[in-house]
């Protein structure tokens, strides 16, 4: 089972020590790595609880207290930086949560539920089609026994006005993802493609 690397854990501890993570939850591949050890993932992507404010200026001032910070992007709703070479992103995110994020007491952070991560991955695939996003969604759908009808219900509950047909088309467009290489995903990639081809076919036939 894979787990956070030592340098990831140490960088996260520094960020958590600032007290800025309490209004955020971790999502993305690293959230799944912590929960399941399913693949290696390098970045920490934090999102605001829907009802919490995002004070970009205040948060960035706290982060600047750390040494070896390199800013990549700052705006009123997004902060992205490197700490000791580890990438952190903090986003204002107003979409509703389908599940309450769970508190990981060992790390001192909240981690998004699988339903929310799956929806976010589905939208990410429609936007850019990364191999990591395909793999993570494949992992979650298999783990929970979800078909695309179930995924559609979840996605439409989280993103009210979304056109799910765009996601369906994206789930069988693999050209960009095939260009990417990740050692721990490659052994499963053929299975991932076949899984989504099958699920899309079943969805369109029903």
From Swiss-Prot:
Keyword terms, alphabetized: Plasmid
Gene3D superfamilies hit by this protein: JHP933, nucleotidyltransferase-like core domain
Protein name: Uncharacterized protein aq_aa25
The species this protein was found in: Aquifex aeolicus (strain VF5)
Lineage, highest ranks first: Bacteria, Pseudomonadati, Aquificota, Aquificia, Aquificales
